[in-house]
From Swiss-Prot:
SUPFAM superfamilies: beta-beta-alpha zinc fingers
Annotated region (Disordered), positions in chain: 110-144
GO molecular function: DNA-binding transcription activator activity, RNA polymerase II-specific; RNA polymerase II cis-regulatory region sequence-specific DNA binding; zinc ion binding
Function: May be a transcription factor for genes having (A+T) stretches in their promoter and/or enhancer regions. Binds to AT rich DNA.
Official protein name in the record: AT-rich binding protein
Lineage: Eukaryota, Metazoa, Ecdysozoa, Arthropoda, Hexapoda
Length: 373
């Protein structure tokens, strides 16, 4: 019974189950499964049948765990051949002892260790790669989140700025301050003498130019206020009893061309319209707005009241200072002037608000004093 054999370049014959090792005239067979050395092919065949249950080409799977070097076998054979040649020269055939090679598992253990180390390195490399990918993904998410927050903050700041601008524009457009810049004016000597005699404050009025004497006023009078909104108010005053001279004087005052032009940001308020319309009511002896001592009247219950004697106003005040503030409505006087832009105001609070908005001045309200002449 034969075996399929392949002769290699290094004088080794390999089969599927064993290795044929040649040395001179002798050879031996090494079992690949258990590394046992056998002398003949019959012994090898019987060995693989009995020990490894090999039946007609069906064998168990095995792995080669060791390698044999032919140089060691040849060195051992050469040593034994030299020894026998020095003996009897008549001997033609010499039996060469078999080189006994015992398989050790060191080579297989080293291979297994190297494979384990290689697998561990691969696993570690894969873990590091996964960690790097996770870190990059987390960084990308953080960057996207920061960009979203920055965008939201920018939108909020822009909306707040737009709201502030709208609010400031609304406030500036809804202001009801009336600015008048009259020239330097003085009161007539008669009014100054009367004010000095009554120890009252002299308020300078707008310059009243010489008025032409109009014809007698009709029953229905029309008063036109020269304002920025060009509002014309008509009224029907009651029958006026008095001399023609007084009526003509009042009409001249109303229609005189020397009145200063009012610059208003909005239409005239109800109080201003009432003040303009009241100029054709029953006349008084004087157009001066100086509060006099004779305007105080005692009521039935003994309380003292100060009554506004400007034409037909007749409003009552408990304190004289309140009445003086009220008379400013009739006189159109502006005692509080802005030292930066020459704007004038009736009340100090309006001047304070103007200085805060227009000139960004704060904390100097105590320095605002009415202008005295």
């Amino acid at each position: 019974m034969g075996f399929p054999r392949i002769l290699s370049k290094n004088n080794k014959i390999y089969t599927k189950l064993g290795e044929f090792c040649l040395s001179g005239d002798s050879f031996w067979i090494v079992c690949h499964t258990c590394q046992e050395e056998l002398q003949t092919q019959d012994q090898f065949w019987k060995h693989i049948q009995d020990e490894h249950n090999f039946l007609h080409g069906v064998a168990k799977e095995h792995s080669r765990t060791s390698s044999y070097c032919l140089t060691d076998v040849e060195a051992a054979a050469a040593t034994s051949g030299a020894t026998t040649s020095q003996g009897a020269g008549s001997v033609t055939s010499v039996t060469v002892p078999l080189a006994l090679y015992h398989c050790s598992t060191k080579y297989s253990e080293d291979d297994q260790r190297e494979m384990d180390i290689h697998e561990a390195q691969q696993q570690q490399h894969q873990q590091q790669h996964q960690q790097q990918q996770q870190l990059q993904q987390q960084q990308q998410r953080d960057v996207a989140k920061e960009l979203a927050e920055l965008h939201a903050n920018a939108v909020a700041v822009a909306s707040a700025a737009a709201a502030a601008a709208n609010e400031s524009s609304t406030r500036s457009s809804s202001g009801i301050d009336i600015k008048i810049e009259p020239p330097c004016l003085t009161l007539p000597p008669e009014m100054q003498a009367a004010a000095a005699a009554s120890n009252a404050t002299i308020y300078h009025l707008p310059q009243l130019g010489p008025a032409a004497v109009p014809p007698p006023p009709p029953t229905t009078g029309f008063v036109s206020a020269n304002v920025s909104t060009s509002t014309t108010v008509s009224t029907t005053p009651p029958n006026v009893t008095g001399s023609h001279s007084v009526m003509q004087q009042q009409a001249g005052v109303l229609t005189g061309s020397g009145l200063s032009t009012l610059s208003m940001s909005v239409g005239p308020s109800t109080a201003m319209a009432a003040a303009l319309l009241s100029t054709q009511e029953l006349p008084k002896d004087s157009n001066s707005t100086t509060a006099s001592a004779g305007s105080a009247v005692s009521s039935d219950d003994g309380e003292r009241w100060y009554i506004c004697d400007y034409e037909t106003c007749g409003l009552k005040f408990k304190y004289k200072s309140r009445m003086e503030l009220h008379r400013v409505v009739h006189s159109k006087e502006r005692r509080f002037n802005c030292e930066l832009c020459s704007a004038s105001f009736k009340q100090s609070c309006n001047l304070s608000t103007h200085r805060k908005k227009k000139h960004a001045l704060r904390g100097i309200k105590s320095e605002i004093l009415p202008q005295r002449f």
